[in-house]
């Protein structure tokens, strides 16, 4: 399954992330948080069963023109069940982690448009189609 979401912030906050040193690399820490979140989804969500994981990938795309970061998480499991809940959990944990590290620079940070892009595994599954037509990606 593949999910993504955005975090919008001030130009100062985004520059802090771009210029962050390796010891305090905001996106690396957010990536670790998201991967840890994959393993904890069944503990965080009532009635959600643990999924044995095969693959977790966390990517970030920085758009300096609009001071926004897109987080994309792809999760595959060893079971036949999909990993949609894990992917959505991970995206939000990555965004919250970024928020937590730059909130002292910008108190108007907005996390938005967290959604599922692909359901199922990488070889088969349903692509998200924005049926409602009211979301601007």
How should these model regions be labeled?
Residues 1-49, 55-137:
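C-terminal binding/interaction regions
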